[in-house]
């Protein structure tokens, strides 16, 4: 791969000073904000290229919505999942209930806002949180080829302690017949999936599977269908970066998903998966330095899918 990742990481590290770590979840406030790492899984060479803090573990947070959506599709099929969750941008904050109230919709707008992600968790097979989360964790380990992916109990407890808005979303859906099941049990699985520790390398592998149309490039095994890969990448392109999704598509142009743990997952169809980590965030909850670094990588390698 014709790119000096080490030099790019160091050139963009200064942007970590322009953001702030997430503080509304106490455990995330303890993370060193100066970190920046990247990994690219190149499909053509079937090889990983890494630089910076690419192997530092951090909370996956909202990026978890991507692999969990894939698992829900495997459990239920695309038609069933999207009869229960929409595919439209919400026009409201990621943790808002307003879209369902104002538009009188009987389902969340999309699977990447919190209401939609909670609904997706409720669709997973498993009779309780223990079974459901075991399936989530096993799937994450498989799709990211990392058996060391684990739950961070401290972050999970922080998520649960500060999760009242998510509880309100879940109870609203339950009370209006939008979601079935035990709310507390479903939310426990949701809080846990957000609290799983991954690395930039893990995210690059996840992106590579999506880029490779559902086939894990390290062993050639098909994990999910071409159609599923296409749908998920389309959703990532539309609203994967919270309120910055539109600007991100214009300026960088890659199917991506961010999380307040500082990670960004990107998938470049038929080319590569990219994982980035830098915990200092902008006002929208996206990693400042990771976005700057990703822009440079996309420009130098001509990865923008719209150009």
Swiss-Prot record:
Q: Which GO terms describe its biological process?
A: glutamate biosynthetic process; glutamine catabolic process
Q: What are the disulfide bonds?
A: none
Q: Name one Pfam family in it.
A: Glutaminase
Its UniProt entry gives the catalysed reaction(s) as: L-glutamine + H2O = L-glutamate + NH4(+)
InterPro entries tied to this protein: Beta-lactam/transpept-like, Glutaminase
What SUPFAM superfamilies does the entry give? beta-lactamase/transpeptidase-like
Keyword set for this entry? Hydrolase
Source domain of life is: Bacteria
| Residues in the signal sequence | none
Give residues annotated as binding substrate: 62, 114, 159, 166, 190, 242, 260
Q: What is its EC number?
A: 3.5.1.2
Q: Can you name one GO molecular function term for this protein?
A: glutaminase activity
Similarity section: Belongs to the glutaminase family.
| UniProt cross-references to PANTHER family, sorted A to Z | GLUTAMINASE (PTHR12544:SF29)
Give the quaternary structure.
Homotetramer.
Name the UniProt record assigns to this protein: Glutaminase 1
């Amino acid at each position: 791969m014709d790119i000096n990742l080490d030099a790019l990481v160091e050139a963009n590290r200064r942007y970590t000073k322009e953001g702030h770590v997430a503080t509304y979840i106490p455990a995330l406030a303890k993370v060193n904000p100066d970190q920046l790492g990247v990994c690219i899984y190149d499909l053509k060479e079937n090889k990983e290229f890494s630089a910076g803090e690419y192997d530092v573990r951090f909370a996956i947070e909202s990026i978890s919505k991507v692999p969990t959506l894939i698992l829900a599709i495997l459990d239920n099929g695309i038609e069933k999942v999207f009869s229960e969750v929409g595919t439209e941008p919400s026009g409201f904050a990621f943790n808002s209930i307003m879209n369902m109230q104002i538009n009188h919709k009987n389902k969340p707008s999309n699977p990447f806002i919190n209401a939609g992600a909670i609904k997706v968790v409720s669709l997973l097979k498993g009779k309780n949180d223990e079974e459901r989360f075991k399936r989530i964790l096993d799937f994450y380990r498989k799709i990211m080829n990392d058996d060391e992916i684990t739950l961070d109990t401290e972050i999970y407890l922080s998520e649960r302690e500060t999760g009242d808005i998510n509880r309100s979303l879940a109870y609203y859906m339950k009370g209006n017949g939008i979601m079935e099941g035990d709310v507390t049990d479903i939310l426990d699985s949701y809080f846990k999936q957000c609290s799983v520790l991954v690395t930039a390398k893990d995210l690059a592998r996840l992106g590579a599977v999506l880029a490779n149309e559902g086939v894990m490039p390290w062993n050639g095994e098909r994990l999910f269908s071409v159609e599923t890969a296409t749908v998920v990448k389309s959703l990532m392109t539309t609203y994967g970066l919270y309120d910055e999704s539109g600007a991100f598509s214009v300026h960088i142009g890659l199917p991506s998903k961010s999380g307040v743990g500082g990670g960004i997952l990107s998938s470049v169809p038929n080319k590569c998966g990219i994982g980035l980590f830098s915990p200092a965030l902008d006002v929208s909850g996206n990693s400042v330095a990771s976005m700057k670094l990703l822009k440079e990588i996309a420009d130098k390698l001509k990865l923008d899918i719209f150009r």
